[in-house]
Amino acid sequence: MAFMDFSQRLQQISANSDALTQLGRGLEREALRITSEGNLSEQPHPVGLGSALTNKWVTTDYAESLLEFITPVSQDVDHLLTQLSDIHQFTYRQMGDERLWPMSMPCFVGKENDITLAQYGSSNTGRMKTLYREGLKHRYGSVMQVISGVHFNFSFPESFWQELFGDQSEQDRQDSISDAYFGLIRNYYRFGWLIPYLFGASPALCGSFLNKHNSSVDFKQLGCGTYYLPNATALRLSDLGYTSNAQSSLKIGFNSLDQYLDGLNQAIRTPSDDYADIGVKVEGEYRQLNSNVLQIENELYAPIRPKRVAKDGEKPSEALGRAGVEYIEVRSLDVNPFSPIGITEDQVRFLDLFLTWAVLTPSDDMDDSELACWRDNWNRVVLDGRNPDLMLKIGCNGERLSLQDWGVRVFKELQDVAVVMDKAAGNNKYQETCERLKGWVLNPDLTLSAQLLEKVKQNEGIGSVGHQLAAEHSQTLAERSYGFYSQPEFDVEAKISVEKQQKIEQGDTVSFEQFLDDYFADLK
């Protein structure tokens, strides 16, 4: 694979239509529950949704009010989006007059302590999940933790790897796949700024959010409580959003699975003086799981992650170490405020194209300084991406290229991928998506952030826009009928999830303290 260029690799996989029609995709969408007045819900997790610990479709993220909707893996884009829509419809039917906040950045958030941590019952596993969130609260504050996004899980089928690598032993295949996914990840850091440019939807913030952060950014003010940057795309991905200064010193590389796991394992074992000052157990009450830089692996902030489905009791890094990378998780998508389900078909198809292009495009190793240069491009795009004169770095050698020129170059090759994918599927959907979004590169006013900022300006603030969109989406979903699942299926899953939680609680045989000692035994 190493000696072939992009077009040769594309030609190679185009020989097998299954290689590009059997892509695996899964979606996770986060959304805050709000009252009909637009305030953060203080109600517990709706009973009709079952157990947040064990329901396979609906859970909670950081807060009791922060829902997370999870689809299974699908090879069909329409099925994927219909499943996500059905899960939303079911959820709305359990929420009374509450609604879902339609944006990534929270609004109308009062004090930190107004945000109730997600509750998962009395089992050791459930208590550990809540305690982890308690640690996040002490470390970063609750307001940052209720920023929401959409995560896109993505994998290539065996037929794809067969076309690229031919016959291999099981171990060689596993290593080749992991190496290819890490090549994709490096290219994602190089070129993935296209995602916040096109789909970033957090150009403005509520003052209630900004008040909790000391910012040196020169915001413009709108009305009495909205702050924005004229050309911003995704403030969620900036230092104001979900990032961690404490993690900036971590050196986690993406040149190989071994390098990545070494960095991750070091991070969960590295003590932090700042976090030690918080205390782990104070006056008999736990404040965090431990005082290391990362309490657990999931605390690592990253715009993309290599993943493998873990077995029971297995940590994410152990799963990767056992059998290599199985799929990747894209974490840079803002919630699309104009979609009732937070994402559209065009966005999914673009990600299909972009991630396929990223794995087929040669990807040299990347040291820490080069990674820092690429991260700087991301920061420029999230703060100033719609500036028509914006220049981005090409690596660390001082060369620069305009975002627009670079975007057009990438789209030229994405178009080649689209032709091959459409031929395999027997339609023109990928080419149509590609053509539409290329227009967004040429005209920043078409991007999601531009559309949203225009609406915010017209309505004199982000709060009223969010409230209006939440009401519209609620109505839209209420008028839809299920397209994939059924009400009985959802009801059964909710009932079974409660039974599963009870079984877990009844199955505990050790104290919570012993449970934590056992879980972190390998860190000692």
From Swiss-Prot:
GO cellular component terms, semicolon-separated: cytosol
Statement: the UniProt record of this protein carries the keyword Ligase: yes
Class of the enzyme per the UniProt entry, highest EC level: ligase
InterPro entries in alphabetical order: Gln_synth/guanido_kin_cat_dom, Glu_cys_ligase, Glut_cys_ligase
S-S bridge residues: none
Entry EC no(s): 6.3.2.2
GO molecular function: ATP binding; glutamate-cysteine ligase activity; metal ion binding
Protein's UniProt keywords contain Membrane: no
GO biological process terms, semicolon-separated: glutathione biosynthetic process
Pathway terms, separated by semicolons: Sulfur metabolism; glutathione biosynthesis; glutathione from L-cysteine and L-glutamate: step 1/2
Chemical reaction(s) catalysed: L-cysteine + L-glutamate + ATP = gamma-L-glutamyl-L-cysteine + ADP + phosphate + H(+)
Keywords: ATP-binding, Glutathione biosynthesis, Ligase, Nucleotide-binding
Domain of life: Bacteria
Alphabetical list of PANTHER family matching this protein: GLUTAMATE--CYSTEINE LIGASE (PTHR38761:SF1)
Similarity-based family: Belongs to the glutamate--cysteine ligase type 1 family. Type 1 subfamily.
HAMAP family with a match to the protein in the record: Glu_cys_ligase
Name the UniProt record assigns to this protein: Glutamate--cysteine ligase
Organism: Photobacterium profundum (strain SS9)
